[in-house]
Amino acid sequence: MEVSLLLMEQIAQLFIVLLMGYIVVKAKLLKPSDSKVLSVVFVYLIMPCVVLNAFQIDDTPEIRAGLLYSMAIAVGMHVVFLAFDTVIRRPLKLDVIERVNIIYSNAAALVIPLVQALLGSEYVVYSCAFVIVQLILLWTHASACLQGSTKLEWKKILINVNLLAIVAGALLYLLHISLPAPIVSTLSSVGNMIGPMGMLLAGMAIAEVPLKKVFCTLRNYLPVVLRLLVVPVIVLLLLRVVHAAGWISDGKAILMTVYLSAITPSCATVTSMAQLYNRDAAHSSALYVLSTLLSIFTMPLMIGLFEVLI
C-alpha cells in the first residue's frame, strides 16, 4: 500500500493547487475565460516539452520492449473501453456526452506528474503510449460520436501538437540523437510545470460551474462512477486474468504507468470538443468537475487494489 499512500499524498498536493485556481477566480483576480490563455501554454508549450524530454533516454532492449508492451496494453485497454460502451449505453440510456466522458480519461494532463513522482521520470515515456492511442481515438471515434457522423478528423490528428511532439521524440530516440544539455534542461524545467498548471486550469474550470447543481444532479454520478470505479475494476481484473505484469521484466511498474492513465477522471478535451460540435458542453463540464474532485479518493483506492491483485 506504500505506492497508494504516496499517490494520495501527490494527489493531495495537486488538489491544493486546484484550490488555488478556484480561489483566484472566485476572488475575481482572474476571469474563467483567462483559463483559455493558460490552456494554450499548457497544450502548446508544456505538454510538448514533457513528451520530448521523456524520449531523451538511452536506447536499450529493455526500454524498446517496455514501449511495445505499454502500447499493446494501451490498445487493449481502449478496446475494453469501447466494448464496455457498446454493452451498457442502451440499457443505461447513456447520451453521447456521458459515453465519451466514460471512455476517455484525462491521462495526458494528470498522469505524467504522478508517474514522475511515483516511479521516476524514466517511466514517463511509457505513459506516452496511452496518450498516443487516446489522441487517435479522440479525433476519430469521439469526434464522430459528438458530430453524429462517421467523418474522420484526420487533419486534426496529424497536426495535433502533442502527437507531433511524440513523433519527434520517438524519431530522436530511434535515431539515437541526444539534444544538447541546455535544451534538455530547459525541456525538463518547463515540463515540470505540467502538474501545477493542469490543476490550476482544473480549479479555474470548477470555479465557473455551479457546484450545487453538479453535486445535486444525481444523474451525474452514474457516468462518473462508471469512469472512476467500474471501468478501472474491469480493466484490473482482466490484467490479472491474463497475468499482464509477467509478460516482460519490470512489467508491474510499466503496467502501473499505463493503468494510472486508465483510472484518471474524465478528459478535459471532451468538453472542448463538445463546445466545438455544439453539444451539451455544460453537462460535459459538470462530469469533468465531479470526476476530477472524486478522483482524489478513487485513484489511491484503485492503485491500492492494483498492488494487491497484480
Describe each model-derived feature in a short phrase.
Residues M1-I310:
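Alpha-helical transmembrane segments of multi-pass small-molecule/ion transporters
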